[in-house]
Amino acid sequence: MGWACLVIIVCAAWRPAPAHAQPGLSAAADVIFYGDNTEFRNAFSEGETMFGVAARGEARIELGNGVRLAAGVAANQRFGSESAFELVRPVLALSVRGRRSTFIFGTLETPRAATPPGPDHAGPHGLLPPLQRERLAFDRPFEAGLQWLFHGARLEHDLWLQWQRLNTAEHRERLDGGARLQWRVARTLALPLQAHIVHEGGQLFDAGPVRDSLAIASGVVISKATESGPSASPGDGSGKAATTGTLELLGLWSHHVPDRQLPQRTRDGAAFFGRAALEWRAWRTHLLMWRGDDYLKDEGDPNYQSVRRDGTRWRGIRDYAETGVTRTFVPVAGAVLEASFRYHRIEDHYEYSYRVLARVQVAGKIR
């Protein structure tokens, strides 16, 4: 049924060109090499070191008027794994692109690693880590569903809905949807809104509880940028030595339903998230602080959650903080290298982590 719908949409979008014209054809690749060492264990999270590469290659057919059909393959390979690939999926996407807006049906445009820089921005859609953990960009670098991207003078957003699993006799279907919006009110002030929900359900098979996990975040973003002339550092990806300071203050609300048939297990939580960052040339430093009360969110970073690793409830206020530094290198156009170091405080537990990323994006016209 899904494939039939896609064929119908492609046929509807295709408007025959004159006999002398042919659809444009190009090829593109997006490859992310990742090395993430958060090998520390505490009461809330397990430690794991991840090294590997997530790659996506595709052929693109330009049908005209901003309509593009893409087909290819995506794969994720973990270094040291007994399997050749942890994940292999077909890339199939129909996109309609305008001056500011892009609609995608099929394989989504994720992840966002290294754009913008910083490990705390590395999630698949750039959500706050309590809503969606950063490491999903490496655990699950492939997503498929619907997506609407918009980049305007004041408003930008990423809205999506993606299916992770079908409803079978063994398990419920699983899908997630979200929104990351920011409205620039003034040059130095913006209003963000982020939301994410994970749902498990389906009516074909009754295999387990129906679950929902929702979180919403909103607040203010204050930023100030100054330029002090040409950059003296080659390969730093910046034509000028710009200094940008950013302060984010957001409140969060969570609604966690582990089983709709057992409403007494439903938990609502609230939290505060604050982050200050300073970017200068190819360097970025950040400090973030978190205070949460009964906050629970599927796919959120466990270091922010009000539940222990063994599943027991944390009663009282949860505290988390981290500080870090990131260095970005741009040796050539289309290639970005990022190295970061972070120091974490999880209640009374202190640990450090580091991450190395390299992202290469290339595209070329065939005809």
Residue ranges, per PLM feature:
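Surface-exposed coil loops of outer-membrane beta-barrel proteins
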Residues: 102-182, 197
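Transmembrane beta-strand segments that form the barrel wall of outer-membrane beta-barrel proteins
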Residues: 29-43, 68-79, 155-167, 191-205, ...
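Outer membrane beta-barrel transmembrane domains
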Residues: 115-134, 260-267, 277, 282-342
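Outer-membrane beta-barrel "beta-signal"
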Residues: 350-367
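Residue-level signature of outer-membrane beta-barrel architecture
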Residues: 23, 59-63, 94-98, 150-152, ...
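Repeated loop/turn-to-beta-strand initiation elements of outer-membrane beta-barrel proteins
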Residues: 25, 65-70, 100-104, 154-159, ...
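Signature for the C-terminal beta-barrel architecture of outer-membrane proteins
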Residues: 151-277
